[in-house]
């Protein structure tokens, strides 16, 4: 399971006793979950008013940062295109996989100095992730524009002979050029009509050059034929061709234009390759930064809610549980039995009641502090 439960309970005589009791009830006795202590340093508490306000702000920040983490992960998938099997190896936090990072979580003192107030630390995180989100939008927009232009040109090289680019199909020698009297037309003929075309093309107009047709290219359904005729017979030929279910494609051979299209495709393809490496590196680095910020926000939320629930002095144990998939319901029941004494109203709580300062949706209200962390960021099954 990629789901973790980050919970806290007040210290008994010691926080170690709280840990031992929970671990014995869930992991050692019943194998309901895999557990780790979640280390939160001694943070500055501040006033109760500040904590209540901060609880609301952290809930919003948590949602925002999680959305940025998922956006970066999803965009990494989009950018890697044909190498999607390599996505997970690029989604790391501090160089380790996400499960390892969470289960061995250590507060980053350099990024988020604990001498600062809780509000200041949350503002550092908010500013950092907002900047990453803005950078992501700008980089994604530039890369997507480049990718879109390239795909648009590539689409011209596939599809129907009526619409696709002919730059890689026709050559200069396929046409009569710079003639005052003669011109070359391109005609699309379905494969079933090849015999009919060969039999009739010379008679579709009075001024068709005999034996001038040539098959230049064919796809699964049709062939592209050239035919040479007098310029003044073009309109008559087109009309007769249409009546015989032969499609004349409007095409003017322009070497410079076709060369420019090829050069543009080469340029776009080169630019995309040049941007690919730096973009993947940026995504990798900033995924790590954002994920780390997200888990620190979870730590801040646990700290704030624990103080609001359990009071001062600060005395609680934060614990990370990874539920065994088949035992989720049983685990919840064991935790309820373990901690129901913390909140006598928990058993009869009204789903419509809003509990000030706790900022938990009612379907996730428990007598202990609880937050879910799901590291299945790409929603892979």
Curated annotation (Swiss-Prot):
Name of the gene this protein is made from: atp6v1c1b
Top-rank taxon: Eukaryota
Pfam family for this entry, one: V-ATPase_C
Family matches, as PANTHER family: V-TYPE PROTON ATPASE SUBUNIT C, V-TYPE PROTON ATPASE SUBUNIT C 1
Function: Subunit of the V1 complex of vacuolar(H+)-ATPase (V-ATPase), a multisubunit enzyme composed of a peripheral complex (V1) that hydrolyzes ATP and a membrane integral complex (V0) that translocates protons. V-ATPase is responsible for acidifying and maintaining the pH of intracellular compartments and in some cell types, is targeted to the plasma membrane, where it is responsible for acidifying the extracellular environment. Subunit C is necessary for the assembly of the catalytic sector of the enzyme and is likely to have a specific function in its catalytic activity.
Protein name: V-type proton ATPase subunit C 1-B
Keyword Transcription regulation among UniProt keywords: no
Quaternary structure and partners: V-ATPase is a heteromultimeric enzyme made up of two complexes: the ATP-hydrolytic V1 complex and the proton translocation V0 complex. The V1 complex consists of three catalytic AB heterodimers that form a heterohexamer, three peripheral stalks each consisting of EG heterodimers, one central rotor including subunits D and F, and the regulatory subunits C and H. The proton translocation complex V0 consists of the proton transport subunit a, a ring of proteolipid subunits c9c'', rotary subunit d, subunits e and f, and two accessory subunits.
Keywords assigned: Acetylation, Hydrogen ion transport, Ion transport, Transport
GO molecular function: proton-transporting ATPase activity, rotational mechanism
Organism field: Danio rerio
Family per similarity comment: Belongs to the V-ATPase C subunit family.
